[in-house]
Amino acid sequence: MSCTLDHLIAQWTRLGVAFSAPSAKESPDLERLLLNTARRAPQNARVFILAVTWLCRYGDLVARHRLKRLVADELELEYRPVLGMLLATVREETGTAHFNAVIRDCPPADEAAPLFEIERKNEKLRRLAERHAAPISRQWNLWARAFRPKDEALRPVRWILERNPGYRIRADLKGDLRASIIAALADDPRAGESEVRLSRCCGATRSAVRDSLDDLETAGRIKRSHVGRRRRISLTGMELKNRAHGRRRSVRVANN
């Protein structure tokens, strides 16, 4: 589901990005935040630059299997080039292969044009955007100048995890399939109704999901129970407590 630019900025503020804006009241669904960033970034260059900056430092928090599935299921075709360019810029800056599978599902725009709306609407700015476009932006047919990540605009990881305790397991799991399972159980309605449904939500095979569930159950992160002929999966009290703690903390911060 899409969101307004103001709400998007509030969510990034919650994740430690230095926007002059109030923070969101709850931790964002990180993978859907990236989809909404692709939708709204053309309206605001700072959003694009700081999203790249955040992912360069904290990209391992993203559950990459789930992101790939959400791109296929929820992100409109017109915004996939924006997400592809965003993630490819992160890859170029860091050398990470974390987002390769997602990038492959995000083709370049059909027609070359400026990335940012303000430059599309003005012929002079449009010509300047084309003239000064960075090589990577030309690959995506979305002209934009080269830039350097703004590391000074980010809070440290400790700050982020204190305010978003549900992200701690993301930090532990480095965005692998187990992270996608936890994120799906937390944010996708009915994901835990069966292994088949959970596999679809994570964009992975049932066999791979089952192996990851074994690991998560051993670690006390999830529990499985039989409901009729199905095997239902849910977060344990430990994970639910982490998420509830994050919501309570946001209320205290807002009231101070």
PLM regions: where:
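Eukaryotic acidic, serine/proline-rich intrinsically disordered low-complexity regions
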Residues: 121-156
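Short acidic, hydrophobic short linear motifs in intrinsically disordered regions
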Residues: 181, 189-201
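N-terminal, charged low-complexity regulatory/assembly segments
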Residues: 1-127
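A short, conserved structural fragment
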Residues: 217-228
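Short, amphipathic alpha-helical interaction segments positioned at domain boundaries
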Residues: 237-256
